[in-house]
Amino acid sequence: MFLMNASPVVALQSKWEAFGPPGSCRFPRCFSEADEGVESASVSARVQMLISTLQRDGAARGTSDERAAQRGHRAEGCHDARPAAKPTVHKEPPALAVCGLVADFDPMGEEETTDFGPLVLDSDSDDSVDRDIEEAIQEYLKAKSGAAQPGAGGAQPGAAQPSRAAGGGSRCKPEPAHGSAPTALCPPKLVPGSGGGPGSQVGSSKDQGSASPVSVSSDDSFEQSIRAEIEQFLNEKRQHETQKCDGSVEKKPDTNENSAKSLLKSHQEPPTKVVHRQGLLGVQKEFAFRKPPRLAKMNVQPRSLRSKVTTTQENEGSTKPATPCRPSEAAQNKGGIKRSASAARRGKRVMSAAQASEASDSSSDDGIEEAIQLYQLQKTRKEADGDLPQRVQLREERAPDPPAHSTSSATKSALPETHRKTPSKKKLVATKTMDPGPGGLDTDHAPKLLKETKAPPPASPASRSEFVERSSCRADTSAELMCAEAILDISKTILPAPVEGSDGSLSASPLFYSPNVPSRSDGDSSSVDSDDSIEQEIRTFLALKAQSGSLLARGESCPQAAQGPLLPPGLNSQTGGHKTPLSKTPDPLLGCKRKRRGGGHVRPSTPKKMQEVVKDGSQDADHSQGRAEPGHERRDLPIQGKASEALGGEGTARGPGDTRMSQGQGKTDEARRLDEKESSEDKSSSLDSDEDLDTAIKDLLRSKRKLKKRCREPRAACRKKVRFSTAQTHFLEQLGGLRRDWKDRGPPVLKSCLSKSKRDSGEGPGKKPPSVFGSTAERMRQEGAASQDAALAFRVRRPASASASEGNPFPRESQGPAPSPGSLSDDSSSVDSNDSIELEIRKFLAEKAKESVSSSEVQAEGPTALGTGGPARPEVLCRKEPAPPPGVCTRSQRARGVPHLAEGLRGTESAGAQGTAGLFSQGGKGLPAAPARGDPVPPRSTSGGVSAKGLSVSRRNVYVHKDQSPRGAEPAAKSAFGQLPSCATAGTEAGGARGTFHMGCGSPSFLTPSPGAERDAGAQADRTPPWSDFAHQSRLPSPWVLRSEGRDAVWRGGVGSERDKGSEGPARGLPSLPLAGFSPLLSTQLFHFGKGVSWGGRQAGLFSPHLGLPLQGPSFSAFREAQAGPSPVFGSPHLLAKKDGGPWPTRKAQAGLSLHDRRSSGSEESILDLRYRRRVNRDDQEQDALGSDASDFSDTSTEDSGGSSVVKV
């Protein structure tokens, strides 16, 4: 109403006036929300762009108007339910002038209307108002067509360029310049619009559009701007394609109906139009930036079609006054209109229909919907009867003709702009086409063109019939689609994306196919009347498409392959061949779009599709998923495999897809793993949340982009690269030095194994679930593996938890995404590869465990032991631990048990570094994600610089804790040092993870020092030989570090961190891995105990008795003895604390101890350095291997490791 009543004038004035004021004043609802200043600035910039665009692209605007007119025409036809109306309107030659004006008006008017359209849709929520607007628009269009036709002919020729120039310079003048016709058309509206010529109108509409959309959603505007940019790029890209396809497009119209011809003509002219449309697109994009997300998307998707339909609708209805701007724009664009005279005719004809349809589109009235539905049904039937063959022929002809123009093959003229826009719009259109359905429904050609453009795969007559029927179905569901679009826009990031996991992601993956999916679901769900047969046809087609898509998808494993293959084999034979490559052509564009859009828009369209699919597509989706799912699911898995897997229900249907996923496993795994990392790390706690799913989908889409590239690479390579790079590299990146050392020591094999296992693990569980389920299953399996294989279980468990998450991951997956495991199991290659990888990993880990045991025994301090500890760390103990801090006890127990097994294997290694490193690794690694951490852990274990490793591990732990914070590991890591309270448990985990798991265990219990002591006793007993000195240091660091770090220093952070750096760092650095890892661990655990002590000083009793007596007794006995000698201050935990802090029990005393201990740690550093100068040198050597100084890592990275949890957590 606002637009109808005052907005046109306001729109014209608002832009030229203060951009802000007019918007706010004139569009109270829409523009008042927007920031006038921002609007004016952006609008001014956009107006400039629009002016230049209009000047350059007058013809394009005419073309755009024609498109809008076409859409409007189609919409009108649909709205009026009179398919003959189009031809009649099209046949109106005088309408050309009017159309030129109208079409010319439309470009800016549409742009304005694009803004207005959203505004109208947003502002005019009353059906009565919408109906009134629609009626007024229709009447106005009729009157305008009659009145503007005479003057339009004269105004267009002479005034077109002047108003164009004037429009470029001052748009108010061109308005009079283009005068007579515009006056005829615009007199009532020129008055409102006269003040602001097209430019001002556009400005106002931009301003308004910007204002209201900006107020509506800056995110949407941003996304739309991204879309606009993407569309621009795609349009530029497709411009050439369109130009190429223009010939074919021109050829195709012959077979097409008049409407098809008009569409084709308007699209044939797009070479010029395309250029102009691109300008318009840029302008509209600008508008879209500010447009309400939904309408912006609508405008963005079929911008030339949908946007202009909506724009025309709203221009006519809401921006009737803005029509004068159109005349001025028409005058400006008349040159372009002359070029697109026929297009202008079509535009005019379509415009009348479009305006009527726009009213229906914008109003979304039940009556309009009914009219549109009726018309669409009639038209669909007629087209299905007669048009479909022609269109099918055209489509088939086009399929061969525009192979370069992938969409044109499926699209009538491949709608050059539609094709250009299709990549962006395909997604959007997939989304929007369902929504544009209302406006573009009666333009079954246009919707079909868009749909076909989107889904060129259905290039077959059946496909076309399906699309036609779907169009009618969409017409039926136009209101639903619009509502769904709005809902999807709102919830696009929530449920729709995940819901569409199978179909949606497939649709997202194959934009071409995705229209099919939505159209399928839409058609099936919406047009139950005629869609039952259509649905069956669609399902049959989709089944064929799914079969061919599955075959091709298996062959290509890329969405592109599935896109082309999705077409029925027979249908695809002609168009499929073209479309497959053609779809590939859009795929890069889509990839660019997805990259630019972050896949967000694909999701939006996909969610809509999924909504539709979920709505009624459930039948068709289930049916066609059953059939087409092979093709769909594969893509779905790569695209949203994780989300789909998260959608357990779809996961079942994805069984076939997962089977294919083995082929696309590289992609799917990568996507899953990436999503698993991101989502499991960031949102593993809220895997069930739609946002997380959306994020996972985004990640999956990103992964898919990467996978598309990697997809082209060998799948195995992709897996390795993907798995390792995503999961393991993710850790290894943080463990860069460790990873290098690990690599240096030959864990590359393990890496590959781990990569595979991780890859499989990621595949099996479906990333997020794997992180969650895999974590649990891995814990369970790892526990079992720990009992099965000690050192091997450590290593294998890490990889086995990865690889076991491959083999066992199936159980693990079965926990979460059983279908995925099933599909993976179905995927013999994945199962075989998983099993073989798991076996290889286990073998390699067993060998490496032996080597590590030998090397760590040789090294005693256990850089390798740490590495071994790394495997021990991967023990699910840690994972379990994150789940239950008491699990730290279990973890420590398991660390004790398994680590002790490993330690038993490791012997001195365990006693030395393994005890510390192993416990540390277990603690650090286990806590984060035993398997995931385990993977990097081997680098640690292998890598020298244990301190660096330990630090990295601690970081890793911290990081892992963060990653697993959803799991509670992050709190553990943070708690480890940062959150000492939970640190006692989580911190114990982190500390245990970080350092002495024994201590960690004891820490959770410091309470359970006996387990920790037990473990320390056992593991440290093993350590004791190598730890005699370490015992001093580790114990020294642990008691004083723990105590001072204890809750005090560490809790205090600065002192704790410093002291962790100093004491723990030195201890850690000094003992290198064993001590470095163990000291901080002890520090962490003693730290936890220290916390306990610092809490009350009872820790002196608790810590001393437990840690002091048990840990110090068994483990620290040597430590204590050695320490007592080497560091009197560190005589024993009690002695140490008491010596250092005298008042061990008191935190302040501990704080003093922290400082004192730090001093002691400094001296201890000296002492340890002196005592362990050799060890420090070893650490330095190892750390040098890591390329970092032990003390530096100890202080700095210890901050990260010991303090990592403390400081950096």
Swiss-Prot record:
Keywords: Nucleus, Phosphoprotein, Protein phosphatase inhibitor. Ubiquitous in normal tissues. Expressed in numerous adenocarcinoma cell lines. Residues 201-219, 352-362, 821-836, 852-861, 1187-1209 have a biased composition (Low complexity). The modification Phosphoserine is found at residue 1161. One of its GO terms (molecular function) is protein phosphatase inhibitor activity. Residues 63-91, 226-255, 442-454, 609-637, 667-685, 757-766 have a biased composition (Basic and acidic residues). Residues 57-91, 145-279, 291-471, 501-532, 555-694, 733-836, 848-1033, 1052-1072, 1118-1209 are annotated as: Disordered. Pfam families: PPP1R26_N. Interacts with UTP20 and PPP1CA. It comes from the Eukaryota. This is Protein phosphatase 1 regulatory subunit 26. It comes from Homo sapiens (Human). GO terms for cellular component: nucleolus. It is found in: Nucleus, Nucleolus. InterPro entries: PPP1R26, PPP1R26_N. Residues 301-321 have a biased composition (Polar residues).
